[in-house]
Amino acid sequence: MADVLRLVVGLGNPGTKYEGTRHNIGFMALEQMASREGFSFRQQSKLHGLVAEHGIGESRLRLLMPQTYMNDSGRSIRAALDWFGFTPEQLLVLVDDMDIPLGRLRLRGQGSAGGHNGLRSTIQHLGTQAFPRLRIGIGAPADNPAERRARTVSHVLGSFSRAEQPEVDVVLDGVLEAIQRIQRQGLDRAGNWINGFCPASVE
């Protein structure tokens, strides 16, 4: 099937300075997957990122963490699609979203960047908005629009608080389940579960 999931990309910024920040929750999801499933990432310079493989046969996935910094993520994703011979429809991008409460997920088969520089770069390099993305809620820094704008950078580049960590753990588990469901069921059926995902703490 042409639209079978083949490549999962977690967006984030490389380096210890950004480890554990809200903007890096895409990286965090793939790192947790690697830890649980017992595989590791390796540097692949031609793809400008860290790459891993998981599964066999029809369930085999390539996983990518671009090392280009968020604003140039699309360069790494374009290189990976070309190298492996995949189409944008066979891609899933894991991306943080400030417009979604922490603990919630939103799956979309296509769409605009929504103000996210990593998605903007991906759209530019792929030449299309038609690729699946899993938006992972990180919550907003404030309800007031002016205060929210003023605190956006410090919020996304800040770390999750100790109080938020239990919800982070739950949503990362949800991301891994979401990937498995997309593999088994496809985007539409999996989306029903993913878009309804809501830990009790955020209901």
From Swiss-Prot:
Site Discriminates between blocked and unblocked aminoacyl-tRNA: list residues. Answer: 13
Which Gene3D superfamilies does UniProt cross-reference here? Peptidyl-tRNA hydrolase
Q: What class of enzyme is it?
A: hydrolase
PROSITE patterns annotated for this entry? PEPT_TRNA_HYDROL_1, PEPT_TRNA_HYDROL_2
The family database entries (CDD domains) matched by this protein are listed as: PTH
Q: Which residues bind tRNA?
A: 18, 69, 71, 117
Active site annotation, chain numbering:
23 (proton acceptor)
Question: Which molecular function terms from Gene Ontology are attached?
Answer: peptidyl-tRNA hydrolase activity; tRNA binding
Keywords from the named record: Cytoplasm, Hydrolase, RNA-binding, tRNA-binding
Q: Which GO terms describe its cellular component?
A: cytoplasm
Cite the NCBIfam families for this sequence.
pth
Instruction: Report the sequence similarity comment from the record.
Output: Belongs to the PTH family.
Could you tell me what this protein is called?
A: Peptidyl-tRNA hydrolase
From which source organism is this entry?
A: Parasynechococcus marenigrum (strain WH8102)
